[in-house]
């Protein structure tokens, strides 16, 4: 797919200040270093400012301070990365699906599918499903009994929704994601595990995105709940009964244990792990590889992951860490010895 749009049209769409030729044609996006004729680029990170000098981009998205002194065509905006995100959709080559049902799809007789939805090849849609207008169901998707998918949803090929999954409007779910799988619940008796039926479901709000191979387990009793605007990267595990507040984002390989509650506008970096039955308040940022073992009640940034260092230094640090208990005992003995000497000196002075 190719598209041509005039620079003035982009400026109007963004509400940007245009410096340059409004009639010049734009055909794509690229980085400052790789952009060529017909392409728009952007400067979001100050460390790339030096690339402005030699960029071949036809136009650049710039903040007012960076636009001063730039001789080329510019769209001046308060937030260049946000502006780039907004215009990126004009040039998205993702194929658009036509409304209708592929002849190989298997659909239950009582499923309610809006005529404006698109159902791909070999999709399976079970009894009681409701699919709203503008929804795209990719090839080989499985939509279990009584699932509901709101307007404008997009499911990539090979998405699996178990029964009783309810999805809001404009939700995007990438390939391999599984929503509504059984939670990891077992009762133990004399060393033997007995399965607990997971009778809840999964509820997603509006404008949620779920990455490739991410799993969201169904609740044991009530639903596992994902709030509006939540963004989940690839290969995330969300266990049963978890609740995630609106507009929280998580990078790849986060693992959240059962019944944990995460607030609104939180950010979890890659590889973060959370134990079960804890609560994270709104506005928390957790850095990569952090292990969260208790509730967080104050907004802010939290870390426990060990930062990289040269291997030789890391080995020395690891060796010292193994001796830390012994060092603590020696320090306690030294403190007691100093305290004894100090007390004796004080008695001598008093005498």
Curated annotation (Swiss-Prot):
GO molecular function terms attached to this record: N-acyltransferase activity
Catalytic site positions: 240
Main enzyme class: transferase
Presence of the UniProt keyword Repeat in the record: yes
Gene Ontology annotations of biological process type: lipid A biosynthetic process
GO cellular component: membrane
Keywords in alphabetical order: Acyltransferase, Lipid A biosynthesis, Lipid biosynthesis, Lipid metabolism, Repeat, Transferase
UniProt keyword Repeat, yes or no: yes
Protein's pathway: Bacterial outer membrane biogenesis; LPS lipid A biosynthesis
Source organism, top-level taxon: Bacteria
InterPro entries: Hexapep (IPR001451), Hexapep_transf_CS (IPR018357), LpxD (IPR007691), Trimer_LpxA-like_sf (IPR011004), UDP_GlcNAc_AcTrfase_non-rep (IPR020573)
EC number, UniProt record: 2.3.1.191
Catalyzed chemical reaction(s): a UDP-3-O-[(3R)-3-hydroxyacyl]-alpha-D-glucosamine + a (3R)-hydroxyacyl-[ACP] = a UDP-2-N,3-O-bis[(3R)-3-hydroxyacyl]-alpha-D-glucosamine + holo-[ACP] + H(+)
Function: Catalyzes the N-acylation of UDP-3-O-acylglucosamine using 3-hydroxyacyl-ACP as the acyl donor. Is involved in the biosynthesis of lipid A, a phosphorylated glycolipid that anchors the lipopolysaccharide to the outer membrane of the cell.
Summary of subunit composition and partner proteins: Homotrimer.
Family statement: Belongs to the transferase hexapeptide repeat family. LpxD subfamily.
Name of this protein: UDP-3-O-acylglucosamine N-acyltransferase
Organism: Pseudomonas syringae pv. syringae (strain B728a)
